[in-house]
Amino acid sequence: MSDWSLSQLFASLHEDIQLRLGTARKAFQHPGAKGDASEGVWIEMLDTYLPKRYQAANAFVVDSLGNFSDQIDVVVFDRQYSPFIFKFNEQIIVPAESVYAVFEAKQSASADLVAYAQRKVASVRRLHRTSLPIPHAGGTYPAKPLIPILGGLLTFESDWSPALGMSFDKALNGDLSDGRLDMGCVASHGHFYFNNIDSKFNFEHGNKPATAFLFRLIAQLQFSGTVPMIDIDAYGKWLAN
């Protein structure tokens, strides 16, 4: 009989994330450096544990009309079926059709940060996305419906007390349209998600928050399926400009 413990493995994953986020908070005094370090912890976690069809990175998102999103701390995008990802001077630019999820990653949750994250998420969801019919041996399948882009917030701490209480809920309910934050994690306290059945936010306290958030994200990505077939010609027209 093996000496492995699944419970201990899950706990170790969360403890590693929490420790590294805490170290970033203590070790860096400059807000920009502190933010970059925290962002890097979340990106590394997602790149390590999400299936390899997904990639996570700090990126801009662009559509075929030439519109760009704000810079997004963590973009989860398709790497298996995406025909192109731009990289220029260390900046990554992802076509809107390839995006599964976007997250704002900062040190501590607050009303201002929630509103800021909502604006960032909305800047991605408002982009134009194409979807072409899919060819097969007998003809074509209809164009795949566009998948919902998940939005969220990732932090180490919360400015509120209690950390996941009514104030947090009020801030999240400030935008339930293009800027809605579907899920997120406050690594020191718990995670949250929007319950589509009850149309309200649920808060889960403790219980290895980083690991619980990761599992919920993976489950949501499974329901998303694959990204639509991108219209390359719609992007190619910019070659003539």
UniProtKB/Swiss-Prot annotation:
Residue numbers annotated as active site: D73, E104, K106
Cofactor: Mg(2+)
Site (Binds cAAA): R53, Y81, T226
Residues binding Mg(2+): D73, E104
Enzyme Commission code: 3.1.-.-
Activity control, per UniProt: Activated by cAAA and to a lesser extent cAA and cAAG; cAAA and cAA are products of its cognate CD-NTase. Cyclic nucleotide binding causes hexamerization. Cyclic nucleotide binding causes a series of shifts that enclose the cAAA molecule, enable hexamer formation and juxtapose pairs of active sites to allow dsDNA cleavage.
Swiss-Prot/TrEMBL site (Gate loop latch) positions: H136, Y141
Keywords: Antiviral defense, Endonuclease, Hydrolase, Magnesium, Metal-binding, Nuclease, Nucleotide-binding
Coiled-coil region list: none
One of the protein's GO biological processes: defense response to virus
Signal sequence extent: none
Record-level Gene Ontology MF annotations: endonuclease activity; metal ion binding; nucleotide binding
InterPro entries, per database record: DUF6602
Pfam entry (one): DUF6602
Effect of T226Y: Loss of endonuclease activity
Family under the similarity heading: Belongs to the NucC endonuclease family.
Biological role stated in the UniProt entry: Effector DNase of a CBASS antivirus system. CBASS (cyclic oligonucleotide-based antiphage signaling system) provides immunity against bacteriophage. The CD-NTase protein synthesizes cyclic nucleotides in response to infection; these serve as specific second messenger signals. The signals activate a diverse range of effectors, leading to bacterial cell death and thus abortive phage infection. A type III-C(AAA) CBASS system. A cyclic nucleotide-activated dsDNase. In the presence of 3',3',3'-cyclic AMP-AMP-AMP (cAAA), and to a lesser extent 3',3',3'-cyclic AMP-AMP-GMP (cAAG) and cyclic-di-AMP (c-di-AMP), endonucleolytically degrades dsDNA. Binds one cAAA in a pocket on one surface of the trimer; cAAA binding promotes hexamerization, which is necessary for nuclease activation. Also binds c-diAMP or linear di-AMP with lower affinity. The nuclease digests dsDNA to about 50 bp lengths with a 2-base 3' overhang and a consensus recognition site of 5'-Axx|T-3'.
Subunit structure: Self-oligomerizes. Forms homotrimers; in the presence of cAAA the trimers associate face-to-face to form homohexamers. The 2 cAAA-binding sites are on the exterior of the hexamer at the three-way junction, there are maximally 2 cyclic nucleotides per hexamer.
Entry protein name: Endodeoxyribonuclease NucC
